[in-house]
C-alpha cells in the first residue's frame, strides 16, 4: 500500500516542472524556504499545543474572543460604578433637595390629570374650541 503511494508520487514528480535556475548558473544563491515567524515563536507553539490538548479533552474554548470578553467586563464594571454613584448621590442629597423633588413630583402629577380629561372629551367639543380660536383669529386679523 505504502509502496503504491510512493510510486504515484514519483510519477507526479516527473510531471511537475523543475526550477531552471539550478541547472544554468551554479553561482546563483539558491532560495530557501522562509520560516513562518508566527509558527517559529515559542509562545505560538505553546498556545497551539494547549488548544490541541483542550480539543482532545473536549474542553470547549470560549466562543467569544478575548477582546470581546474584556469589553463586556469593562461595560459591566462601568454600569456597576454608575449605579453606585447614583445611589451615593441619592444618599448625599440634603433634606431640602429631597423636599424640592417631592414637591416637583406632586406638581407634575397635578398637571397631568387635566390633560387626560381633554383627551377623553368628545370630538364635537374639541372642534367647537378650534372654531372659536379660528373665529377670534380672523376677527383680530380684520382689526389689523
UniProtKB/Swiss-Prot annotation:
Sum up the protein's function in the record's words. Answer: Stress-inducible actin-binding protein that plays a role in synaptic and cognitive functions by modulating actin filamentous (F-actin) dynamics. Mediates polymerization of globular actin to F-actin. Also binds to, stabilizes and bundles F-actin. Involved in synaptic function by regulating neurite outgrowth in an actin-dependent manner and for the acquisition of hippocampus-dependent cognitive function, such as learning and long-term memory.
Does the keyword RNA-binding feature in the UniProt annotation? no
Which InterPro entries does the record associate with it? FAM107
Q: How does it assemble?
A: Interacts with ACTB. Interacts with COMMD1; this interaction stabilizes COMMD1 in the nucleus. Interacts with MAP1A. Interacts with PRDX1. Interacts with F-actin.
> What organism does the record attribute this protein to?
Pan troglodytes
Q: What is this protein called?
A: Actin-associated protein FAM107A
Q: Which Gene Ontology cellular-component terms appear in the entry?
A: cytoplasm; focal adhesion; neuron projection; nucleus; ruffle membrane; stress fiber; synapse
What gene, per UniProt, encodes this protein? FAM107A
Q: Where is the composition biased (Basic and acidic residues)?
A: 112-124
Write out the coiled-coil annotation as residue ranges. 67-94
Amino acid at each position: 500500500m505504502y509502496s503504491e503511494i510512493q510510486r504515484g508520487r514519483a510519477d507526479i514528480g516527473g510531471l511537475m516542472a523543475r526550477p531552471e535556475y539550478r541547472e544554468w548558473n551554479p553561482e546563483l544563491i539558491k532560495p530557501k524556504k522562509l520560516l513562518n515567524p508566527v509558527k517559529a515563536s515559542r509562545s505560538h507553539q505553546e498556545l497551539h499545543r494547549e488548544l490541541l490538548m483542550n480539543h482532545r479533552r473536549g474542553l470547549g474554548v470560549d466562543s467569544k474572543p478575548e477582546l470581546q470578553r474584556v469589553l463586556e467586563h469593562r461595560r459591566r464594571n462601568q454600569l456597576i460604578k454608575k449605579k453606585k454613584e447614583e445611589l451615593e448621590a441619592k444618599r448625599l442629597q440634603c433634606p431640602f433637595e429631597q423636599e424640592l423633588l417631592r414637591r416637583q413630583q406632586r406638581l407634575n402629577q397635578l398637571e397631568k390629570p387635566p390633560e387626560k380629561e381633554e383627551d377623553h372629551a368628545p370630538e364635537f367639543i374639541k372642534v367647537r374650541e378650534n372654531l372659536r380660536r379660528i373665529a377670534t383669529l380672523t376677527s383680530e386679523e380684520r382689526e389689523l
